Amino acid sequence: MYAVFQSGGKQHRVSEGQTLRLEKLEAETGANVEFDCVLLVANGEEVTVGAPFVTGGKVTAEVVTHGRGDKIKVVKFRRRKHSRKQMGHRQWFTEVKITGISA
């Protein structure tokens, strides 16, 4: 059984027991969170597609940890001007473990 849900402006395909990194959620470590923006639920040969969301569809997960991703370097270079700007960015994330899928 798997589901596709929406969180943080992105869509994720998940199954029970899977861990994944999402955009930062305001939840404590160890807390349970529910995602009700479920786009698709598949159980074997039975597939339910929402328009846009599946009615009664829910994905539950447990917050494992919060953290920051790898550093990305951004360079803005101005040719022939002897000028450049260098910045770094580390995106916050929340790692969750999927505990249940219901439709």
Curated annotation (Swiss-Prot):
GO terms for biological process: translation. One of its GO terms (cellular component) is ribonucleoprotein complex. It comes from the Bacteria. PROSITE patterns: RIBOSOMAL_L21. InterPro entries: bL21-like, bL21-like_sf, Ribosomal_bL21, Ribosomal_bL21_CS. GO terms for molecular function: rRNA binding; structural constituent of ribosome. It holds the Pfam family Ribosomal_L21p. Keywords: Ribonucleoprotein, Ribosomal protein, RNA-binding, rRNA-binding. This protein binds to 23S rRNA in the presence of protein L20. Part of the 50S ribosomal subunit. Contacts protein L20. Belongs to the bacterial ribosomal protein bL21 family. This is Large ribosomal subunit protein bL21. It comes from Photobacterium profundum (strain SS9).
